[in-house]
Amino acid sequence: MSGYSRRKFLTRASCGAMSVVVGARSLQAAVSGNDLDEFIEAEMQGQRIPGLAACIVKSGKIVWSKGYGWSRVKRHVAMDPDRTIQNIGSISKTVTATAVMQLWEKGKFELDDDINNYLPFSVRNPSHPDKPISFRCLLTHRSSIADSPAYMSSYACGDPRVSLETWIKDYFIPDGRYYRREVNFHPWSPGKKHRYSNVGFGLLGYLVEKLSGESFTKFTKRTILDPLGMKTTGWMLSEIASESHAVPYVPVNDGQVNKVLQAYKKVGILGGEVERDPVRGSYQPVCLYSFPNYPDGLVRTGVNQLARFLLAYVNHGVYGGARILEADTVQLMLTRQNATTPHQGLCWATLPHEGQPHWFHDGSDPGIRTSMSFRPSDGVGAIVFINRTDVDLKKFNERLYRESARF
C-alpha cells in the first residue's frame, strides 16, 4: 500500500543465508515461517533498516508479531513488538481524530460548525476572511492551513518547551510570534482543495482541550489509552519509560539522505557518535525529540500496544470490552467525505489493494517510519514500525497481508 505520510521532513510545506541478527520475539512469533523472516531480513539489509517490529491482526486479535534487528544499535538492544516504544508520526492523528469524534458524539459540536464558535480567538484564512473553517475541513485536510517554516523548525530534543495553547495562539493570532499570513495559509479558500496539514491537527488537539476542559494528554489518556489498556503509551517522554524507547536513526554515507542529515543538524536534533551494524551499515542517531504541535504526530507506543487501538476500529469501536466510539461513528470516519478527494475519510485514508479497500494511516518523522492499516471486509490489519528515516513500506505491508491467509 502506498503511504499517507506525515511529510518529507523540512522538504515540503504541507506526506542466500544472511547473518542478520533477529531481535526479540513475541509469543505469536513461534508460528512464523522462515520465508517471512528471510523476506523481512533481506528488505532490512537492502534498505539499511536498523530495527523493525510488526504485527498482523485477524479475528479480533494479534495472530503474529515479531521484532527484527535493533532498537538501539550500539547497545544491541533488540527491537521487540511488546517492549519497544517509539514515536509513530502521523498515525497519531487517528488518536487525535478519535478524541475529536468522542466529543462530537457527546453533542459538543457539529462537523460543519465554524471552529471559531469554540475558540477564544478567531482562526480565518486572511485571503478569505468570510469563509469559516469547519471541523470537517480540519479532519479531511481541506482547511487551507499550511505548515510554515516555523512548524518545520519547531523540533527540539526532549519534551515540548512551550504549551500547545501557546504554540497555537502564536501561529494563528495576527500579532503572534509565528503568524505569517503568506506562509501559514494557502491562497485558496477553506474546503476548496485537499492539502495535508499537520498544524490543522494541532489545532484539533487544542479544540479538544477547549471542548473538554482537560489537557489534551489527560483527555486522550482517560478516554482512549487507559480504556484500551495501552498502559505504556503516552505523548510525552515524561509519560513513558524512556529506556524502552527506540533510538531514531538516519543512515550515513547514503547520498539520498545527505540533505536530510543537514536539515536535522540545522534544527539541532541530530548528533552523537555514529553507530555501526556489521550487516546493515552505519547510522547517525537522532535525539528523542518533540514539537509543540504534538497532537499531529507524537504518540509514543509499541506495536502490540497500538494493535489494541487498531482492533477497536476493526471491531466497530470496541476492544476488550471497552468502547471508544460508537459503530456508526467509526463508519462515518471510514466514509469518503468529498468527491474530489475520494481517498479521504475523516482522518483515515483509503486505497484499493487487490481489489479491496484498505483504510490506513502512515507516519514519517526524523528517524522513524510507520504504518497502520486494516481491511474492513475481513478484519485483517497490519502495523509496521521502523526506526529510520525514508523507508518504503509498500513491500512489507503487501507481504504481511499475504501472510495473513496462513492464520
Could you say what each language-model-derived stretch is?
Residues 31-86, 110, 177-187, 356:
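Short, conserved catalytic-motif segment at the N-terminal edge
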Residues 361-362, 369-388:
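Short, well-ordered beta-strand elements
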Residues 1-17:
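N-terminal secretory signal peptides and thylakoid transit peptides that target proteins
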Residues 25-28:
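Sec/Tat signal peptide C-region and signal peptidase I cleavage site
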Residues 46-53, 75-138, 185-200, 294-297, ...:
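Short active-site loop at a secondary-structure junction
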